[in-house]
UniProtKB/Swiss-Prot annotation:
Family according to the record: Belongs to the VPS26 family.
Membrane topology field: Peripheral membrane protein
Function as written in the Swiss-Prot or TrEMBL entry: Acts as a component of the retromer cargo-selective complex (CSC). The CSC is believed to be the core functional component of retromer or respective retromer complex variants acting to prevent missorting of selected transmembrane cargo proteins into the lysosomal degradation pathway. The recruitment of the CSC to the endosomal membrane involves RAB7A and SNX3. The SNX-BAR retromer mediates retrograde transport of cargo proteins from endosomes to the trans-Golgi network (TGN) and is involved in endosome-to-plasma membrane transport for cargo protein recycling.
Protein name: Vacuolar protein sorting-associated protein 26A
Species annotation: Rattus norvegicus
Length: 327
């Protein structure tokens, strides 16, 4: 049985079946148009193997070809320049020499311990994808079919995970101290913290914590930043008083974020910020942003099997935003 669909050409159907398709886990990913796709899930270093099945739809016909091959491809595509895709992985297996097909055939393939250095990603301006590509080479028009796969990059617990503690404010008007329990969170983690009001001389009407995602594509003058508010957490609605302490508890699991991705193949980055927003009675907005790291925690079963993962934990420099006045 095939789990990856087929290509209906004029003569034959191209189909791929993974050797472990019955047991391999699948993962979901949102496409650029908001739809959810489900594909087989792989990790860095895992082999990819299976069969390419060519099924003739019209018995008695002949299919001349200049060779048949399968490729494992890792590719980055910038949506504003779709003609300029970049392949960071391209492995090729030749399945058949030039000749002709007169009946259905199957070909085994295996890509051993494939390096998959980045996480699959679809964002506002960029897509990083992995796929198997089967090509029947012909003189005029090749028969081609692509089968998407999803790759997750796993990480071990960071050795250092300091809390974030800062005192910010507006001179002689407002001073607050905020604290988050960690600076690095796994994707199912809970952000725990508190806000303490040291001085309150302006009337605050509303206060919230936002989780902001910034997708940065390109380099130099051609850099584009897409900002998206992933989550909002209302801290308070009403005026605080001096000495008041307000707890924070934000569950990341409900928002399905991606891991932090830094300078992926010199093409793009994905960074996350906690944005503390205050609104006064004159509807003026004050904010303070702090960058955090998000990482993908390995499942218990895989943690026992592996001790080394490619993702490293660094301390990115905070990136100030020019969208609103900062406290």
């Amino acid at each position: 049985m095939s789990f990856l669909g087929g290509f209906f050409g004029p003569i034959c159907e191209i189909d791929v079946a993974l050797s472990d398709g019955e047991t391999r886990k699948m993962a979901e990913m949102k496409t650029e148009d908001g739809k959810v796709e489900k594909h087989y899930l792989f990790y860095d270093g895992e082999s990819v193997s299976g069969k390419v099945n060519l099924a003739f739809k019209q018995p008695g016909k002949r299919l001349e070809h200049q060779g048949i091959r399968i490729e494992f491809v890792g590719q980055i595509e910038l949506f504003n320049d779709k003609s300029n895709t970049h392949e960071f992985v391209n492995l090729v297996k030749e399945l058949a020499l030039p000749g002709e097909l007169t009946q259905s055939r199957s070909y085994d393939f295996e890509f051993m311990q494939v390096e998959k250095p980045y996480e699959s990603y679809i964002g506002a301006n960029v897509r990083l994808r992995y796929f198997l590509k089967v090509t029947i080479v012909r003189r005029l028009t090749d028969l081609v079919k692509e089968y998407d796969l999803i790759v997750h990059q796993l990480a071990t617990y960071p050795e250092v995970n300091n809390s974030i503690k800062m005192e910010v404010g507006i001179e002689d008007c407002l001073h607050i101290e905020f604290e988050y329990n960690k600076s690095k969170y796994h994707l199912k983690d809970v952000i725990v913290g508190k806000i303490y009001f040291l001085l309150v001389r302006i009337k605050i009407q509303h206060m919230e914590l936002q989780l902001i995602k910034k997708e940065i594509t390109g380099i130099g003058p051609s850099t584009t930043t897409e900002t998206e508010t992933i989550a909002k957490y209302e801290i308070m609605d009403g005026a605080p008083v001096k000495g008041e302490s307000i707890p924070i508890r934000l569950f990341l699991a409900g928002y399905d974020p991606t891991p932090t991705m830094r300078d992926v193949n010199k093409k793009f980055s994905v960074r996350y910020f906690l944005n503390l927003v205050l609104v006064d009675e004159e509807d003026r907005r004050y904010f303070k942003q702090q960058e955090i790291i998000l990482w993908r925690k390995a499942p218990e079963k895989l943690r026992k099997q592996r001790t080394n993962f490619h993702q490293r934990f660094e301390s990115p420099e905070s990136q100030a935003s020019a969208e609103q006045p900062e406290m």
